[in-house]
From Swiss-Prot:
One of its GO terms (cellular component) is membrane. InterPro entries: Marvel, MYADM-like. The chain crosses the membrane at residues 19-39, 51-71, 85-105, 123-143, 156-176, 190-210, 228-248, 278-298. The keyword Protein transport does not apply. It is found in: Membrane. It is a multi-pass membrane protein. Keywords: Membrane, Repeat, Transmembrane, Transmembrane helix. Belongs to the MAL family. Residues 15-148, 153-304 form the MARVEL domain. This is Myeloid-associated differentiation marker homolog.
Amino acid sequence: MPVQHRTTVVGNTSTLKSPVGILRILEVIFACVTFSLVVHTGRWTGRIGDLCMFCWCFCFAVSLVILIVEFTGVQNRMPVSWKNFPITFAMYAVLMCLSATVIYPLQYLEDKAYSSEVRNYQIVAIVFSCLTTLAYIIEVSLTRAKPGEVTGYMATTPGLLKVLETFIACIIFVFISDPPLYDRHDALKWCLAVYCICFILSIVVIILCVGECTGWLPCAFNKFLSGYALLAVLMYASAMIIWPIFSFDRKHGGTASRPSNCRSSPGNLYAVCEWDKMVAVAVLTAVNLIAYVMDLVYSARLIFITV
């Protein structure tokens, strides 16, 4: 009789039993439950619903891929730096899931036309979205660089700030582009240039770190980071001054007070009146300026980095 050979699948189960591995399993489960409940209710149509659904599904898919890669032990074969990619994704996942957790109930729970059963499903989905966000927050806190630890740049405070800076810039682009709020004066176009240039440079830094391409730079990576952070602070400081002046000062064609016909939907980014959008851009500009100042301070203190 022919001898039958039993196929044994060997995997790195220790990664799944570690605190970070358990967190990633919970992230996959929580995200899956969240978008499954939302799909079951059928209450996610429109651009806002699509955005929330994309956040949950994207985080679920990438977390599952990370679990599979670490279980099979093929991190070294991946075309990305495994010291930088998981923490970068986890930070983006925190911001994406947090945004979806805030936006979804504002957009859909305020509608009283839904039955109590549908609302119950929506509430449970929001709870699981909160749990998903919390799991990613804990993962970031566990995997970020500790004092004195040599790790990937994206696990350091400046690396995490880069993720925050790009995410805030994306929100600014949403508010500033539909309708265009920068067409009224050339000074506002300068502000748009500031947001675009700093966003692109931050994305380039993230790509260089995740792709392990920092050696391509014509200068030392830490000097490039410090110089870029200083440039970003100066540019955002100018935007922080220029945007309010040319948006709210009547002498420069702005609107000082909120118009009486200004109506906004708190959960719909696309249904916010122009004046509220201008306020949001001013606030987000200030927040990003603070982030870049912190980035500059930490980058100046970061002496030795292994990417």
